[in-house]
Amino acid sequence: MYDYAKVHLIYTIPPAIALTTVLAPLFTRRDVFKICFLLTVAVTYTIPWDSYLIRTGVWTYPPEVILGPKLFDIPAEELFFFVIQTYITTCLQILLSKSVVTATYLHNENDLQDPLGRRLRQWKRAGQVTLGLCWVTPLLLGRGHVTGTYMKLILVWAVPVLLMLWTFAYQLLLTLPRSKTWLPIMLPTLYLWVIDTLALRRGTWCIESDTKLGIQLWPHLDLEEAVFFLVTNTLIVWGLTAYDNAVAVLDAFPAFFPTVPGTPSPVLLLKGLFLSTSKYDTGRIQGLQNSLTVLARKSRSFYLASGVFPGRLRIDLILLYAFCRVADDLIDDAPSAEEASSWVGRFSHFLDTAYSTKSDREAFEQALVPFPVEAQSVLRLLPTDKLPSQPLYSLLDGFRMDQRFFTKGSKEDPPVQTFADLERYASCVAATIGELCLSLVYQHDPDRPTDEDTKRRCVAAGSDMGRALQYVNIVRDVDTDALSGRCYIPNEWFDKSSASSPEVRDKEVAHYRKRILDIAFSIYGTNRDAIEELPQYARGGIRVAVESYMEIGRMLRERLEEGKPLDFAGGGKKGRASVPKLRRIWVGWRTMAGWRGSA
């Protein structure tokens, strides 16, 4: 009795609830729009087709297995199946795609320097021909209740939409990792095959024998049913990918789309889809790819956090962070103090040119010449139109302070003599980053403008929080910094007695590490409430960025209190403390759900 409703209660509603629970903290406005849009399209498109199948006797339902209410002869349970299947598959695709910067998978197919782009055009045509044949062939095989009618109806109904979606989204379908394209198709498909097998065996629904081919994938699972669930999940995921393709184009190319709202309109999405691939800016795509590579390699905490920032804010934050890391690497890895100083000068000249109202494109390109090719691609995309210049110059001051460790006499007169020196250094290299990040947050705010007092308060708190994160970084890297001849623990704190043994010195260093860590947590506790005053769309990402880094501090604090070594690696760089991947993900999810760590 009411077997169809029981199928939902036992098999479809629980995974939908589970996915909702996992995704709820991570949902963005675009995710919600995507779900609502796909549900509307899927249900609207399926109702006429399903109604025809039932009215012509291809599908039947024993009266005792359904509750009774129908729409166009479709049982309420069947209508709910359209909704719940679409919802489950959509949520899975959104979850699996959170880490992807989709714009990095776009290609200009006319660019001779991009061989993959040219091959994509060939695959596009091959896919169109294949899908076209799959659509035309059933139409040529006749109509009526003959063997294979159900399969023909599936193909005639689904393939035109698949052809359209392939034409729009083939680039992403071919280049995205399979875990983002095939996995969200196959997981729900396999699950629904099992459910369908159980339902067919129990007689919850059945297919008329003269309308099917008589082939079973396994006992009780007809080939048509297997194809139906595979095709419908493919429709859903390809539709989602087409949406992602449109949004990626809108976000990636401000030259064509200067303003993109938080939730793009259908008309704007179509404009993104119809933009010719020959107009895609290859240099911008490659620069973004290089920036993302730098981010993934240099900061796993910020890489995790970037996945919950929306749209163009995410892209610009990646570009900003990549600029900072490129500068740090070129200056830090210089073979001599003189070479490092030269790099600081080159970056200063680059900023002078980028922010000058008098410089032209030729002067800008000339300022990039001294840099490596990959660095040029990153620097070229720095969003200077949205960033104040002073924090970037202050960042260079921090690098200059770093270089004083390698000048003659630095051992007797180190650059970090007092806590004020340490505070100044952290302000240069980290408080500036907090200010720059929040500048981007306010520039991209899709809601009403924030009042100036709140903005100033949040930017000040963000700068302080940047210092706190830098203190955690300093505590973590004491040993690796020492190997390169640097010590950021204020020199005046140390006992200058020559009689100090290595054991005493180690205890002293551990004590000062804890002292700096305590200062970091004090600043963190004082300023973290300001995050809740930021624009709503960015709060979650900022929370994750801060908490992911402070979790390193918590692990350091725990180990200091237990007297354990601090060079543990949670999967990161050897000799450098880091948080294991699963713990980082757990912290990120809990933070998005509203959790706040201990201060």
Give, region by region, the residue ranges found by the protein language model.
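Transmembrane alpha-helix/helix-exit interface in multi-pass inner-membrane proteins
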Residues: 50-51, 193-198, 470-484
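Aromatic-rich, lipid-facing transmembrane alpha helices and their immediate juxtamembrane interface loops
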Residues: 1-288
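Catalytic cores of Mg2+-dependent Asp-rich isoprenoid enzymes
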Residues: 253-468, 475, 479-599
